[in-house]
Amino acid sequence: MKISLLQIDVAWRDARENIRRAESLMASQPCADLYVLPEMWCTGFDVSPDGHTLEQSKMGYEWMLRKAEELNASIAGSLAWQTEASLRSGRFVNTLFVMGPDGSVCHYAKRHLFGYGGEDAHYLSGQQRVVMQVGDVRVLPQICYDLRFPVASRNTAENPYDLIIYVASWPASRQTAWDVLLRARAIENQCYVAGVNRFGDDLHCHYEGGTTLIDPYGNSLFSLRGSAACASAEIDLQKMRQFREKFPVLKDADVFYKG
């Protein structure tokens, strides 16, 4: 599977402009099977969401559906969303959607809300671990702060996966943690890890990017930093399976999480 990661300079609460920027980056990387956008890619990381936030997110949602069909590819990215449960509490859900070329929609709700930044005041946390099938690849979707909590991303025999996707709005002030933790998740789970961060500035933070694809050995296949950019690489499932068979670390792992 060819995966393409989009490091967008996200315009604050401006879906039309962010769609234009995503279109431009996608055009530079044709023929991918899966395109991945950052966290809250069409609004920016909005910890005080309102009706305008939802309106912009709906525009992003509809565009992802159309674009997946147009490109005959899957498209992933998170949006500030509302569900029946969140509406009852007046909150939103930070939701990672994966749109398929056939019109299918899978989703994951962010489990670990960023209390330091106030996300927990306006969002509901998800409680469900989700593994999605994208082509031949089993994908575990995760969102930003989830990266700091490895138990929920443990690769298990009961619910295994091949690729973790982390979509993020991860500030430059904590860039080292981003770089190190992505490698750790790949090594400890013997899987590919796609870390897709935004670039640019919002009301509070500067973002350097650091978007990367890491193989099961912990090697970065590419790294984007310092500008809006897009890059692609292949997920080699045969190479990953051979490594797991030769060096079967996961069978000796502690059982913390069976979900």
For every predicted segment, state its role.
Residues 1-10, 14, 107, 137-146, ...:
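Active-site-proximal beta-strand elements of phosphoester/diester hydrolases
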Residues 87-159, 171-180, 242-249:
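Active-site catalytic loop in hydrolytic enzyme cores
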Residues 8-9, 80, 110-111, 144, ...:
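Active-site beta-loop-alpha junctions enriched in small/polar residues
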Residues 15, 23-101, 171-172, 176-191:
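Cys-nucleophile CN-hydrolase/nitrilase-fold catalytic domain and related Cys-dependent amidase chemistry
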Residues 57-76, 148-230:
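CN hydrolase (nitrilase-like) catalytic-core segments centered on the catalytic cysteine
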Residues 17-26, 148-154:
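Short, acidic/polar
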